[in-house]
Amino acid sequence: LLNGKKRNIYADKLAKKSLVLIKKFLKEKKYKNIENLKKLMIASFFAGEAISFSMVGLIHPFSAALSSIFRIPHCLSNCIVFRGLKSYYIKEYNFLFNCFNHQKITIENIIKINNNKIEKLYLSTMKHEKPLKNHLGKNFKKKLNYDIVYNIFKSI
């Protein structure tokens, strides 16, 4: 589930538990009832803990940038950014958006990215060195240069 150099058994267990709960939630026909929403909240907690204990992922540096620049909730910015990172997470992307389609959940693009915002988004993304280095290696700045970050944000 998790990848990166700082993975550990504790984070892996949290991630697996989160995924089990998310799958149950998304497969329910009436997912918006209070009991299912409680399960999703717990799953979200487990996922957040897994990420914080393993420092993995490209989504969160991009998502944090999007949240801070556009003042949108973290969960929504994760979903929006996920579309731009599809090539890094093909299997996970397909699973999540198949579940969304099954539930008729749409992720609206509520942001307008212009050239004035791109520089801020780039700088805000790149300051998250630990997860970027963990996911892409110590030369992450070569693998994730301005043009690549620009194209990822423009694709969402």
Q: Can you say where each PLM-predicted feature lies in the sequence?
A:
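Buried hydrophobic packing segments
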Residues: I22-F25, S44-G48, F62, L66, ...
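Active-site pocket-lining segment
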Residues: A64-L123
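Structural motif
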Residues: K32-K38, R71-P73, L144-I148
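Carboxylate- and glycine-rich phosphate/diphosphate-binding segment that chelates Mg2+/Mn2+
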Residues: L1-S54, K141
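Catalytic-loop motifs flanking and including active-site residues across diverse enzymes
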Residues: S18, L58, S77-V81
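Short, surface-exposed loop/turn motifs that are enriched in glycine and acidic residues
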Residues: N8, D12, G48-V56, S68-C75, ...
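C-terminal charged capping/lid subdomain of soluble metabolic enzymes
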Residues: N101-I156
